[in-house]
Amino acid sequence: MLRRDMNIADYDPELWQAIQGENRRQEEHIELIASENYASPRVMEAQGSQFTNKYAEGYPGKRYYGGCEYADIVEQLAIERAKELFGADYANVQPHSGSQANAAVYGALLMPGDTILGMSLAHGGHLTHGASVSFSGKVYHAEQYGITAEGVIDYDALRKQAHEVKPKMIVGGFSAYSQIVDWAKMREIADEVGAYLFVDMAHVAGLIAAGVYPSPLPHAHVVTTTTHKTLAGPRGGLILSNAKDEEIYKKLQNAVFPREQGGPLVHIIAAKAVCFKEALEPEYKVYQQQVVKNAKAMVEVFKQRGYNVVSNGTENHLFLVDLVSHGLTGKAADAALGKANITVNKNAVPNDPQKPFITSGIRVGTPSVTRRGFKEAEVRELAGWMCDVLDNIGKDNEAAVIEATKVKVLDICKRLPVYP
């Protein structure tokens, strides 16, 4: 029999220890992985609700199971809030992840073997934009575009490539690109070759919702995003469109269910609804503005300390530090900073001489630190600490510098907790 007072701590101490350990890690480490963020307690409350128990195949008002009246309310709330937040005419809140949202879009609008043109993973794209190891590069004929030596998209080169390969779909969006994308220019190129423009805005969705980064919705046929990352919601996916095309909407609905997925995760959809409501609040815009301010402030410190920043700056929440001129690898930098309780991820840089598991750069993102209250003064100090660690990798005093930095990190984490 079930009881309300059941808990993990008494029943499964090994698992509870891991959960508590992760809680301590998040509180005591500075999180700079650009794709991570801290969900609010309200979002986590929804994820732990009784909707965990509910099967609800189908869509609101058209379910294959009974007892879905409250599931319908939850999903419709999420749909309407997503549409309001992004200025969309269509929203599907059921995708379990960003990758599954992308798979549904491909499945809705393409046939196996059709040509897609997406940003290369090595130049800042995503696995699902046509990488050879992904379904997107196996099911479809994937061509890849890149960035210039200066770290920006060359739209003239993209136009030339599009005319040469004649894709059925051009894929916009990125996982490691720090500049503004000209969505109107991408739509213009897509129209010239008769292609769909599909944008994966997962990394900048929160910035777009707050109006601090240009929205692709007025230009793309279809847009997807995750609901975590800059949006700071539960881990999940979302499909949006403002194409005013009922045929596309019908194809997207059928591609999510029953093509790609069965029953939706109603508890996660409930958490998405909370997340979208939070993103509609005035303070959310202030938060996203600070995310960009913090990223720009950190970039300036790295440049002042002699580190190369890809594209020489940032216009969003992330930037890449190119370590080639310092003779460092991304793997070594990631490990050293990790010992100081600063979490980043190794990342390839343009024309990277290292293998993907080694890399020559690190990706730095500010959504999480901003969420816990860091402003320009704190992130400038943090960037300086990071440079101290990087400057001393492989030197006699490396361990001492790391330990001294860790003490500073623990102090500021105590002053600015994730969940006070």
From Swiss-Prot:
Annotated Pfam families: SHMT (PF00464)
Cofactors required: pyridoxal 5'-phosphate
Catalyzed reaction equations: (6R)-5,10-methylene-5,6,7,8-tetrahydrofolate + glycine + H2O = (6S)-5,6,7,8-tetrahydrofolate + L-serine
Localization, UniProt: Cytoplasm
Principal location: cytoplasm
Keyword annotations: Amino-acid biosynthesis, Cytoplasm, One-carbon metabolism, Pyridoxal phosphate, Transferase
Residue positions, PTM N6-(pyridoxal phosphate)lysine: K229
Gene Ontology BP annotations: glycine biosynthetic process from serine; tetrahydrofolate interconversion
Enzyme superclass (EC): transferase
GO molecular function: glycine hydroxymethyltransferase activity; pyridoxal phosphate binding
Residue spans crossing the bilayer: none
Pathway it works in: One-carbon metabolism; tetrahydrofolate interconversion; Amino-acid biosynthesis; glycine biosynthesis; glycine from L-serine: step 1/1
EC number: 2.1.2.1
Binding site for (6S)-5,6,7,8-tetrahydrofolate: L121, G125, H126, L127
InterPro entries linked to this entry: PyrdxlP-dep_Trfase, PyrdxlP-dep_Trfase_major, PyrdxlP-dep_Trfase_small, Ser_HO-MeTrfase, Ser_HO-MeTrfase-like, Ser_HO-MeTrfase_PLP_BS, SHMT-like_dom
Domain of life of the native organism: Bacteria
Entry GO CC: cytosol
Residues at the site labelled Plays an important role in substrate specificity: H228
Disulfide bonds: none
Record family assignment: Belongs to the SHMT family.
PANTHER family: SERINE HYDROXYMETHYLTRANSFERASE
Quaternary state and interactors: Homodimer.
Function summary: Catalyzes the reversible interconversion of serine and glycine with tetrahydrofolate (THF) serving as the one-carbon carrier. This reaction serves as the major source of one-carbon groups required for the biosynthesis of purines, thymidylate, methionine, and other important biomolecules. Also exhibits THF-independent aldolase activity toward beta-hydroxyamino acids, producing glycine and aldehydes, via a retro-aldol mechanism.
Official protein name in the record: Serine hydroxymethyltransferase
